[in-house]
Amino acid sequence: MFIRLLTVIVPQKPVSIDPSAGVSYIAERETAVYTEPSPTPEPTELTAAPAETGFLEIKDNNFNAAFKDIHICGDSLMEAIYEYGILDGKYITAAVGVNSNHIDKNYNDLVALKPKYLVLHYGSNTIGSKDAADSFISDYKASILRLKEQLPDTEIYVDSIFPVSQNAASKQKKFNNIPYYNEKLAEMCSEIGVHFLDYTILFNDFETNYYDKDGIHPLRKFYEEQYLPFVYTEIMRGR
């Protein structure tokens, strides 16, 4: 059972990227990149995906066409989608090592963009003790409410914090608090009237199939096979 959440934009500049490089490349980047908008692609046809996934099919795996009305905003986990070459930079606003104040830093650009759907992904760089969760939620909520005031017609989705591998959690105990933080995120979304996207169910095989060597950052195929199809399905079915 999927739960809704959400979003971002990244300016794009000429850069030679090896899509297989993964986290090692992303870690070298300190800021996101933005590109001038290109002509709007033709709308994608909504068709059923194979029964084993339950996702709507993204026609011809054309993620740019599928996400033409969706903007994703977040940290390095979202920047990876651009760095891997899955989505163009104009659909993403992301940077390495940021937290929810990244929304405020890009506030004017996001408001000017006026996306139909906005997906927000923050928390991996902020997560700490359970006692620190309230401060994280308070800051995040304030940033979202500020956006809602200027973007009343934008549907906002908030991502859950991605789980990490058992090995990564054993090295950094704070990651054991991810479920608690996600509970707080779900409560926040319900309180302020935005969608919550809970990806926990997608990580059943994440340990062996989807992690980079650090056990924290997903590989390219996670975004192509799981994350983006799930986001697309949740948004299309909920519109």
Regions found by a protein language model. Give the residues of each.
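Extracellular glycan-modifying ectodomains
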Residues: 1-28, 80, 113, 125-126, ...
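N-terminal secretory targeting modules
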Residues: 1-67, 83, 238-239
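Alpha/beta-hydrolase-fold catalytic nucleophile elbow
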Residues: 121, 159-160
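A short helix->loop->beta-strand "cap" motif at the edges of active sites that frequently abuts
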Residues: 151-155
